[in-house]
């Protein structure tokens, strides 16, 4: 449904006043007639280019219809649908990202739509608000660290389609890891603009593709330009003098894979390509708050490395000390309860079982980066799934001893007293003392000194070997799985210290040094009913 006003501005204003006066007298605001009156106001203000009021009435109509407040017969169903989508069109044209996504896919079956099946969780995770704030000039940098195949690149493509539609005379520059990736971006933007399955031509009826090149990866809307509406470049080759970023700099997966992430020289080259041929193509523009700023950046990313392009961009922003206009959204595949963060509606997304299966199948380092949003440097990793020892079943014999080791933050005396009292109350015979662990070595050095013991390597100085449960025996045991993840993710590189979870490897080193290793100043438990502790 399109709004047609052929009158002068003064006549339109008079019509608006008359309609407004009539609506103030309406008692029942749950009728089609009332909605049609609001729709008339929406169209009138849009004709006058009073977009604030147009959006106000469009939003009111959307709320009324979607809430189910308006009652109508089936014969009016199409009419109300037309009114509703026209309101989404109005908001989309003024930069409302969610309205644009809904309006674009209005004619698609819900099970084929991208946005609505994913909307609930994308909004919960702050992704949609982050994109909206970028559109509204509230952010200079938005980073989306999200697992594979949850729709992050499609979000970026819809964002490009919207901004290019709103500002066809300005330039959007997009970069990806290889030519193959930017080929897909180029093809999909053309698809969003031209395919009748989408409603782009209804939202932006005056926009047409007038020039494009699959070889040079550019698209121009409405007129040919030196700096194209859309330009796509590979980060490996960089840009040229004919590229510019005025409305948006879009960076999607600048690091191709873990092999590239593990090569410091290639990462350094990528970063210099980014700073020298991509980032330096940004120009200033007037923002909505009246301030001139360089165009914003969005990085859609897999956080492969502490030293990849996006991680360094974020580190630079943090070092400058002003994060008010920077937002990093990192959502792992699991929530705090171990459930999937991306089990979308209508059968979309992935459940917990899928991610658990991937966790077992994937290399822990790769899984950590791709699915847990934790950059882990393979160079410097000490422990991995293949260099520690495992057991399936405990020996049938009685254990020589059962020990527990706690590395407490605030000193051991108080905690050991409580433990001793509790065990004595339960009639256990035990000998427990506290002792300050050696502090003359850094945590990193303690762990490295015990690395052979943790791996289960027999040495002349020890009389024990350390074994862990087989990986398939700890499925569902969140604490054990987290402990092993921390062990395999521990990195000895100096740069990684204080940036990683090292409690488990440090506690193992403490147990080996202070209990198993024969530090005689530390007490040993002589008789414990292990069953009471679930051991």
Residue ranges and their predicted role:
Residues 338-406:
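ATPase catalytic-site recognition across NTP-hydrolyzing enzymes
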Residues 139-159:
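Walker A/P-loop
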Residues 213-277:
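Conserved RecA-like ASCE ATPase "motif II neighborhood" in helicase/translocase motors
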Residues 414-535:
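C-terminal nuclease/phosphodiesterase catalytic domains that cleave nucleic-acid phosphodiester bonds
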Residues 175-236:
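Conserved nucleotide-state-sensing and coupling region of NTP-binding domains
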Residues 227-235, 400-410:
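Two-metal-ion RNase H-like nuclease active-site motif
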Residues 248-337:
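Signature of the SF2 helicase/ATPase Hel1-core->accessory helical subdomain module
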Residues 2-141:
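Pre-P-loop entry segment of helicase/translocase ATPase cores
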């Amino acid at each position: 449904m399109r709004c047609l006003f052929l009158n002068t501005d003064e006549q339109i204003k008079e019509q608006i006043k008359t309609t407004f006066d009539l609506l103030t007298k309406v008692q029942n605001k749950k009728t089609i007639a009332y909605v049609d009156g609001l729709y008339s106001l929406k169209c009138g203000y849009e004709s006058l280019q009073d977009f604030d009021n147009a959006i106000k009435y469009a939003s009111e109509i959307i709320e009324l219809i979607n809430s189910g407040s308006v009652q109508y017969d089936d014969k009016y169903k199409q009419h109300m649908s037309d009114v509703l989508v026209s309101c989404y069109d109005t908001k989309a044209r003024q930069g409302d990202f969610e309205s644009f996504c809904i309006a674009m896919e209005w004619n698609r079956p819900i099970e084929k739509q991208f946005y609505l099946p994913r909307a609930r969780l994308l909004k919960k995770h702050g992704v949609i608000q982050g994109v909206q704030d970028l559109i509204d000039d509230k952010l200079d940098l938005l980073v989306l660290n999200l697992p594979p195949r949850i729709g992050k690149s499609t979000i970026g493509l819809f964002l490009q389609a919207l901004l290019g539609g709103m500002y066809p005379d300005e330039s959007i520059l997009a970069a990806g890891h290889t030519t193959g990736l930017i080929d897909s971006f180029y093809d999909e933007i053309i698809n969003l603009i031209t395919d009748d399955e989408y409603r782009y031509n209804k939202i932006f009826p005056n926009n047409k593709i007038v020039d494009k090149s699959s070889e040079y990866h550019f698209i121009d809307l409405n007129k040919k330009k030196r700096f194209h509406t859309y330009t796509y470049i590979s980060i490996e080759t960089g840009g040229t003098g004919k590229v510019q970023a005025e409305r948006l700099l879009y960076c999607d997966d600048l690091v191709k894979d873990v092999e590239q992430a593990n090569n410091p020289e290639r990462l350094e080259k990528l970063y210099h390509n980014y700073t020298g041929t991509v980032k330096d193509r940004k120009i200033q523009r007037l923002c909505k708050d009246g301030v001139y700023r360089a165009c914003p950046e969005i990085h859609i990313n897999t956080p492969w490395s502490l030293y990849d392009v996006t991680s360094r961009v974020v580190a630079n922003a943090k070092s400058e000390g002003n994060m008010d206009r920077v937002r990093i959204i990192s959502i792992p595949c699991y929530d705090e309860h171990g459930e999937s963060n991306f089990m979308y509606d209508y059968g979309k997304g992935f459940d917990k079982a899928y991610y658990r299966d991937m966790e077992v199948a994937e290399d822990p380092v790769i899984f950590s980066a791709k699915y847990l949003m934790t950059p882990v440097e393979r160079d410097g990793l000490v422990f991995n799934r293949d260099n520690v020892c495992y057991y399936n079943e405990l020996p049938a014999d009685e254990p020589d001893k059962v020990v527990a080791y706690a590395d407490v933050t605030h000193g051991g005396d108080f905690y050991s007293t409580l433990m001793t009292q509790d065990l004595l109350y339960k009639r256990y015979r035990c000998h427990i003392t506290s002792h300050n662990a050696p502090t003359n070595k850094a945590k990193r050095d303690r762990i490295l000194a015990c690395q052979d013991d943790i791996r289960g390597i027999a040495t002349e100085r020890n009389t024990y070997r350390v074994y862990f449960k087989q990986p398939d025996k700890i499925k569902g045991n969140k604490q054990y799985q987290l402990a092993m993840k921390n062990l395999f993710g521990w990195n000895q590189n100096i740069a990684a210290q204080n940036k990683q979870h090292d409690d488990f490897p440090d506690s193992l080193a403490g147990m080996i040094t202070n209990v198993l290793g024969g530090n005689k100043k530390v007490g040993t438990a002589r008789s414990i009913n292990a069953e009471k502790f679930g051991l």
